């Protein structure tokens, strides 16, 4: 069985890795959708699809997991979004998602929809990790070592800090 899991992975963290490991025990192959692939260089989505692809592939090469990592673009037309995903991915029967809209869209198309159990959401949150990066707090322990290396390679911390700068002084 092949399943689909979509996320923004901004950045890919240990909670994401645990979810993928659990799903891989249930299915033969996982399609890891890199959602909102067109977004980057914002505080919410600082990393490009290619950078997120590196984070995922460099991490998962250390595990016996059969997967495809595929960029998925937002089309802002919910009624046809599932068809867009289908055109970009190998066939699959099951989707894992915590997003209620995505669950609804795939349910309406008769997919088996499962909600993955989040892993230690208190610590493993992309929002919290990006905030720690911005503040200069320790964040490296929250992501796989390979992700730390990718973020260092692309100078991701300084990118996030530059993105947070105001364009002018407020009076």
Swiss-Prot record:
Keyword Zinc-finger attached: no
Task: List the InterPro entries hit by this protein, alphabetically.
Answer: Cyt_trans-like (IPR004821), NMN_Atrans_arc (IPR006418), Rossmann-like_a/b/a_fold (IPR014729)
- Record localization: Cytoplasm
For this record, an example GO cellular component is: cytoplasm
Report any Pfam family annotated for this entry: CTP_transf_like
The answer to whether the entry has keyword Nucleotide-binding is yes
Keywords, alphabetical: ATP-binding, Cytoplasm, NAD, Nucleotide-binding, Nucleotidyltransferase, Pyridine nucleotide biosynthesis, Transferase
EC number(s) reported in the record: 2.7.7.1
Q: Which reaction does it catalyse?
A: beta-nicotinamide D-ribonucleotide + ATP + H(+) = diphosphate + NAD(+)
What Gene Ontology biological process does one annotation of this record name? NAD biosynthetic process
Q: In which pathway does it act?
A: Cofactor biosynthesis; NAD(+) biosynthesis; NAD(+) from nicotinamide D-ribonucleotide: step 1/1
Broad class of where this protein is predominantly found: cytoplasm
GO molecular function terms listed in the Swiss-Prot or TrEMBL record: ATP binding; nicotinamide-nucleotide adenylyltransferase activity
Q: What class of enzyme is it?
A: transferase
Check the record and name the SUPFAM superfamilies matching this protein. Nucleotidylyl transferase (SSF52374)
Family note: Belongs to the archaeal NMN adenylyltransferase family.
**What NCBIfam families would the database entry show?**
arch_NMN_Atrans, cyt_tran_rel, PRK01153.1
The protein's name is Nicotinamide-nucleotide adenylyltransferase
Name the source organism. Methanococcus maripaludis (strain DSM 14266 / JCM 13030 / NBRC 101832 / S2 / LL)
């Amino acid at each position: 069985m092949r399943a689909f899991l979509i996320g923004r992975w901004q950045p890919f963290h240990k909670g994401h890795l645990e979810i993928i490991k659990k799903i891989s025990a249930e299915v033969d192959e996982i399609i890891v959708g890199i959602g909102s692939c067109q977004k980057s260089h914002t505080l919410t989505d600082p990393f490009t699809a290619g950078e997120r692809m590196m984070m995922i592939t460099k991490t998962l090469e250390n595990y016996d997991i059969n997967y495809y990592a595929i960029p998925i673009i937002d089309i802002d037309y919910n009624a046809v979004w599932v068809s867009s995903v289908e055109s970009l991915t190998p066939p699959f029967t099951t989707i894992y998602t915590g997003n209620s809209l995505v669950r609804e869209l795939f349910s309406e198309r008769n997919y088996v929809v499962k909600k993955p159990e989040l892993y230690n959401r208190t610590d493993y949150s992309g929002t919290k990790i990006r905030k720690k990066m911005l503040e200069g707090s320790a964040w490296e322990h929250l992501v796989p070592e390979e992700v730390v290396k990718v973020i260092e390679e692309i100078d991701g911390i300084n990118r996030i800090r530059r993105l947070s700068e105001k364009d002018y002084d407020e009076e």
